[in-house]
């Protein structure tokens, strides 16, 4: 994980307005949302796993599933996850469970990031600053 200092860190927005701005730029809502926090992800690369620019948000008014929820943006960071190419040896639950859970555990949750991608992450954060703060 590589943090990218930004002027958007600590800024608050209505979640709905933030979604309306970020989704057209290519950000998606990460599947690991909770009621009080979540992430917007921008997939930068998908060779040898996935490289994301991740924008964390924390609820400051209401829950993330409520209309009118307000969030505060945290420090953006880049994250690479490398997934197993073979059978997941930690899979549990039997055949019924496998109908719903078809994802393997990451082999490395915080894998090394090629320095060539750091400029891409920084430019994406700059784009967000320009859109959200101006």
Curated annotation (Swiss-Prot):
Pfam families in alphabetical order: YugN
Domain of life: Bacteria
InterPro entries linked to this entry: Uncharacterised_YugN-like, YugN-like_sf
UniProt protein name: Uncharacterized protein YugN
Organism: Bacillus subtilis (strain 168)
Lineage, uppermost ranks: Bacteria, Bacillati, Bacillota, Bacilli, Bacillales
Gene that encodes it: yugN
């Amino acid at each position: 994980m590589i943090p990218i200092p930004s002027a958007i860190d600590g800024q608050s927005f209505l979640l709905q307005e933030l979604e309306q701005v970020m989704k057209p730029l290519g950000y998606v809502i990460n599947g690991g949302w909770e009621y009080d926090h979540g992430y917007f992800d921008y997939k930068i690369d998908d060779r040898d796993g996935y490289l994301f620019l991740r924008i964390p948000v924390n609820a400051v008014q209401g829950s993330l599933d409520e209309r009118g929820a307000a969030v505060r943006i945290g420090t953006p960071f880049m994250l690479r996850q490398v997934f197993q190419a073979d059978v997941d040896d930690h899979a549990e639950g039997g055949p019924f469970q496998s109908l719903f859970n078809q994802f393997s555990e990451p082999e490395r949750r915080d894998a090394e990031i090629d320095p060539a991608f750091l400029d891409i992450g920084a430019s994406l954060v700059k784009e967000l600053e320009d859109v959200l703060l101006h």
